Amino acid sequence: MKINTTDVRTAIYHSLQQWQSVSLLTFKEEYYDENADIKVSFVKGKHNDGWDFDGKGRILAHAFFPSGSMRGVVHLDYDEDWDFASLKQVLLHELGHTFGLGHSSDNKSIMFPWNSSSVDNVNQDDKNGIEWLYGLKNKWAKLSPPVTKPPVTKPPVTKPILTTVPRFPVPTTQVPIIQPRFGNPTTHSPTTRHPLQKIPIQPRFGHSNPPIRYNPPIRYNPKHPLSPPFKSIPNSLLNVVNSSITNLYVYFPNTWNSSIIKFN
């Protein structure tokens, strides 16, 4: 391990301060585990979380996303030769996972999955990611999406090979189906000038109540006589009623005797 408790606490403090400086998150140290949202510990080999360490080299640490029973947990491999710089860098990465960030495809990002000693600060992509999750540090700033993908349910692992753990949760909420505000239309046909309840139209195809459309009164215009398009209808009509199912037209001349005509 090769690192003392004071350096560990200082590395944790500085790592959290970096994330706090670019986000709306705030942190304070707790002395009791049950009060802490984030817990950092050194463990060896098998440690009962399904993600065993492999001794010195390769896997350095892992952390869990902020959901489930292991949320906020950071495990560091006790067998590694830690110093202040390496611990701070790994903590920056793993703490990002506890906030909900996955691996970044930006090789200058602290969330890039390959461990690089040249990257020891959060960059713009990291800032975009944390603001995407928790809001803008500056309320007047423009929110920019990060270049990474949503996280999967498994905890990301810091190791010297490229992994494909995405960053943000895959949305499951479906677009709501908008129901008609007033239900199905119930408005009846407009009332005509004369009662037409007893029109002798016979239904076809077994329909007992064929829909009937009431047309407004047709006034004769000498310039546009009705006889050319409707050769069976007199020039002077009072009203016409049409059934959309039977295709029957009932026309009313200037008398009360109705006539029924079918147009193909």
Swiss-Prot record:
Cofactor details (free text): Binds 1 zinc ion per subunit.
Positions contributing to Zn(2+) binding: 93, 97, 103
Keywords attached to this entry: Hydrolase, Metal-binding, Metalloprotease, Protease, Zinc
Segments for region (Disordered): 176-207
Gene Ontology BP annotations: proteolysis
SMART domains given in the database record: ZnMc
Coiled-coil residues: none
Active site: 94
One Pfam family this sequence matches: Peptidase_M10
EC number(s) reported in the record: 3.4.24.-
UniProt feature, compositional bias: Polar residues: 184-194
Origin: domain of life: Viruses
Cofactor(s) for this UniProt protein: Zn(2+)
Single GO molecular function: zinc ion binding
Family: Belongs to the peptidase M10A family.
Name of the protein in its database record: Putative metalloproteinase 165R
